[in-house]
Amino acid sequence: MLQLAGVSNSTCGGVRNVSVETRNVKPQGKDSKAEENGSHSFMHSMDPQLERQMETTQNLVDSYMAIVNKTVWDLMVGAKPKTTMHIMIYNVHAPPHGDQGVHLLGAAVQPALAWEREDTHGGVGRVGTAARRDAASQSCCPTCTRLGTRRHSWRSRQSRHSGATRLAWEEIDTPGGVGRAGTAARRDSRGNEKTLLEESAEQADQGVHLLGAAVQPALA
């Protein structure tokens, strides 16, 4: 028909090519609809049991990820206070039973109260020293008590010996008192010196015992 109408051969060839291309082109909307229909048909063609397994697996994965995220958050943000509370609750020993705590507190506070009482009521001088010495001698052992008694007896003997020595030297200074009286006086003075040395040694031992008795409660 084109040839009969007087159309050239080149024009006829161009029209043929356009018609062929038009036949080969398909609309895109139809292709997308076909793909969606194919996927839906595939999903519907799956086994229902397999679908349930896939849903269960997905739920488990979501729950595990939530647990992991919460754990990481606790470690990064809330680790310090939780660790502190754990140490305070689980690593503290059990409280004392009954009145044991009260007795322990009283034993710890009593020495401080005793020292304050002595300082307040003027017991720092001789009274405080005597009270401390008596308390130490009573708390240490009976030997310390005997040593305290021996110390008082030593003071009385010392006063008596000093008086006797003074009288002996007065007799020596008087006329006719240089004989046996002078020798006896010198002997008595030497004996007094030995007695003083012995008593000083006993006093040193007593000081050691008193020091041990005073330090023992602090070490305990």
Swiss-Prot record:
> Domain named GED: which ranges?
54-149
Cross-referenced InterPro entries, in alphabetical order?
GED_dom
Q: Where is this region: Disordered?
A: 18-46, 173-194
Biased composition annotated in UniProt, kind: Basic and acidic residues: 28-38, 185-194
Name of this protein: Putative GED domain-containing protein DNM1P46
Q: Which gene encodes it?
A: DNM1P46
